[in-house]
Curated annotation (Swiss-Prot):
Upper lineage: Bacteria, Bacillati, Actinomycetota, Actinomycetes, Bifidobacteriales
GO molecular function, one term: DNA binding
Record family assignment: Belongs to the HrcA family.
InterPro entries with a match to the protein in the record: GAF-like_dom_sf, HrcA, HrcA_C, WH-like_DNA-bd_sf, WH_DNA-bd_sf, WHTH_transcript_rep_HrcA_IDD
Disulphides: none
Species the sequence originates in: Bifidobacterium longum subsp. infantis (strain ATCC 15697 / DSM 20088 / JCM 1222 / NCTC 11817 / S12)
Annotated GO biological process: negative regulation of DNA-templated transcription
Coiled coil regions, renumbered to chain: none
Domain of life assignment: Bacteria
Record-given protein name: Heat-inducible transcription repressor HrcA
Annotated region described as Disordered, given as residue ranges: 296-331
Keyword line: Repressor, Stress response, Transcription, Transcription regulation
Record's keyword annotation contains Transcription: yes
Gene transcribed to yield this protein: hrcA
Function of the protein: Negative regulator of class I heat shock genes (grpE-dnaK-dnaJ and groELS operons). Prevents heat-shock induction of these operons.
Amino acid sequence: MTQSRRMLVLRAVVEDYIRSQEPVGSTSLTRDHDLGVSSATIRNDMAALEDEGYLIQPHTSAGRVPTEKGYRYFVDRLATVVPLSEAQRRGINSFLSGSVSLKDALQRSARLLSEITGQVAVVTSPSLAKATLRHVEMVPVAMTTLLAVVITDTGRVAQHGLTIASMPAVDEINRLSNTVNEQCVGLSLSKSAETVRSIAASAGYESVRGVADALADAFESMALDERANELYMSGTSHLAHSRSLTDLAPLFDALEEQVVLMKLMSNLSEETNASGVGVAIGSEMHTPGLLHASVVSSGYGRSGEAGEPAGNDPVGEPETESETESQTNDMEPIAFVGSIGPTHMDYAATMAAVRAVARYLTAFLSEGRTQD
């Protein structure tokens, strides 16, 4: 579809349907939009759009509604993501700035995003696979068991039991802990595992070799365990108020499959468009429960300058598309923020809200306010 007028007609149909959730006719388009052509010409354009698969007519006497293909073209080519207003950004700042820990910030973010969009909001904790080690402590808890407390650069605290054949002296365990902290801080958990195995094989650590091997195994296990990522969800009650989602059972079943949901949104947040968000519509997700839903997702994570806001505005919304793309490229996503709603969701508003909350969490991590 290359005709510019037809693109304008498609955008008008999608925007009107999102607003009214009623089939859109040529008469209302002529009345409500300055398209510069007659109602008959618009009817012809709508018929052509229907033939091309962008619109569908649910009843012969009704107007048209967008198809999945129509929504996709709208999101990719026609939707304009406008940065949030200063008042909206300060509202987000006011609500989220009171966070006292990473967990608190993630829970607040999910609630806030749900309230802004009127849809289900999903926020995940930073992936342990992409985190780096900040500190590890090993504490004997039984004759042959230690508890390893692992703190990452993102503030995640993970605990893992270490089973060994015999318990070394506490001084030897502490010496091993100090060496691991000296050599592994700033390394990924998988790299830390390699380093710990090297320490275990070196002279002077024979008495704690079993402990070191168990700790290395724990690091590797945590790095590979997708279930270790925590998911915070808010706003499922909004689904009951959506007129288009009449059969909610499959959708609720899909929301219960947290590992599947996290994989879907994680992949989506890494395939962002120029606006810094990823959008999946209906059948694109290959998940039966989400057939009539859309998902908007954006990654958040480590950032140098990109996540550091100017002044007292931690949301730091970009003003232009080029600024957004530059900031997105500078940020390494380690978790995601997402919104789930009907296919007739307000894409532009949802994309802006998801992007803003993701940028706040990036700034939150960059400022180091993550200690639980």
